Amino acid sequence: MKKIFISFFVFIFSVSVYGIQYDFEDGVIPTTINDIQKGTLSVSSDHAKMGTKSLRWDWTATGALFRVNDEVNIPYAIKAFSNRGGLRMWIYSPKAMPGKSLQFIFRNKTVRVYTFDFNLNFTGWRACWIAFSDMWVPGESDDVQPTQQDIDELTIKAPEGVESGTLYFDRWDFSSNINKQATPDAQIPKNNRFLTRDFWHWGRLWEWEQFSYSDELKDLVPTTSELAELREMTTTVQTALFGKVNNTTIANASSKLSAAGIKRDVYTGFISGKPLYTDQEKESGDIGCQDVNDMMLGFAMDYYFNGNSSAAENFMLVFDYALDQGYAYGSGMGTNHHFGYFNRDMPKAVWMMKDYLKSESRWDEALQLIQYWSGLAEPRQPYDINRDELLDTWYTLHLPRLYAALMIEDETERFRAVKGLSEWTNGSICYTPGTIGGIKPDGTAFHHGAHYPDYASSAFGILGDYANYVNGTSFTLDASARAILKQAFMAMASYCNVKEWGIGVCGRHPFNPNECSIKSKNINAFAYLAVDGETVDKDLASNFLRIYETATATTAMNNMKKKFTALGIEKADPMQGFFTYNHAAQGVFRGGEWMVSLKGFNRYVWGAEIYYSNNRYGRYQSYSSIQILDSG
């Protein structure tokens, strides 16, 4: 076994995040892995998550186990208990074992100190990430949180009642810092059970998957009119989503496939290629989930528009590769943080390939994948007003959820899914409490604990598209949601000098023009909301026309302009007067074509958003900043 020293300082200060990583590339099993009972361990090239080899475990009887007596790295990780020290590895299962699980036991000599189970209801690779502080104390109830104890041994026990089987282990280390956003999944549903931020939303896919609809299918009888609306909306959305062929997207897919080296062995069926990780784990040369989305969309587009059969084969190759690598139903991939941003193209790709997937008897599997990674299960239940980061959900997940719902073939099930999403949407367009994400009573929109127009603009753009799709149906926005959303849009029209807002509310990108103004693609939201009710809302329509003049117009925008002009609606005059946004600690004074933005901060609203690589010197951007903006 080759031991990779992640940090030169591991032996000096013991502060490296990963310590020593087992990678098995030299074909040798370390002497610390021993006491193999009722089975064998070997180094295999069948499957690998790092390099070309992994540790293969074949057990031949119940009660099989092996131990890891690592008196250097296990104590190293436990010393970082308060920093979320723990275990990280990837496990490959060639065969799903529903209802069965591995048992991990950490000991101090002969005394069991920590334990956890790893469910084996999967095939392919799955991440096993858990901090010692989230493990279980033998003999104690679930609500007892572990304390730091000395440990020096790990025992891995085969699943009870399974007489023989095979598993593979790779990318294994005893870590001094398990990501605080380690994602609960089907393998360890409570691997982050003492998370203090109850509002965290990226890591809730598996939790949502346990939700049930309040409407039983047998009791749900959609009307003929509702089904007709559903069919028409499905066609409308599908036409808009598929758009036109993009040769650059197609070429990009082929280029990425070649670079990824993804291949299927014609004899064993095993799939090989560069390893796939989410951005938080991905290193140079690895494949990311966005790469998978890019490849699937390009090949789907080539097949759908050009009838290219080899593109269909490549699509299936990438699809199977993704599943094999752990980009699958029920998987958390270690941490899936911000998954909505890298998962937006897959629904479109899968929908394009529907007929082909059905011909391969893979449609149900693909649809399940789309429904899971879009979080469609969340709106099975009413909106929870205390869930956070709502703008991210609107922006990255809302339309994929609609697509996933409309892909359902059974019309009653499709109706239930769209109805649930509609009710959840109406519930989410509300005044959210405190500083959590969402719209506030003064029309500001919070993200990351403060008013954040850049995120709001993008989220509102998606809500506008959604409103356009459901307009005129029984799934449309209700009066309350429409009124609150209008208030937020009109507030944006007043704190923007045409499209641009003040530097004090630019967050961590104060000097990037694309992050400090309403993007052209989001302007149509004003128009779509204007026509969402029974009559055209002249306030929204006239402000759309005012902002439209400064935008790079699309066909849809031009059509909305013609519609409003035909109704005699003229562009709005610039806002006048003083506008107070107490939730944002902001004031805006408008006069003619100019605007003054005043920004402060307080104990509830931060003065600047500073990341390690963003806005390092932006501390004072809200310290009573006064900015004069001209005509935009």
Where are these regions (language model features)?
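Extracellular beta-strand elements of beta-rich domains used
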Residues: 24, 130, 154, 170-174
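Aromatic-lined, polymer-binding surfaces characteristic
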Residues: 231-519
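Extended polysaccharide-engagement surfaces of secreted carbohydrate-active enzymes
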Residues: 466-632
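Sec-dependent N-terminal signal peptides
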Residues: 4-13
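Short carbohydrate-recognition loop motifs
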Residues: 43-66
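Extracellular carbohydrate recognition
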Residues: 146-149, 159-175, 181-184
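Extracellular carbohydrate-recognition regions
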Residues: 18-38
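Extracellular ligand-binding interfaces
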Residues: 59-142, 162-167
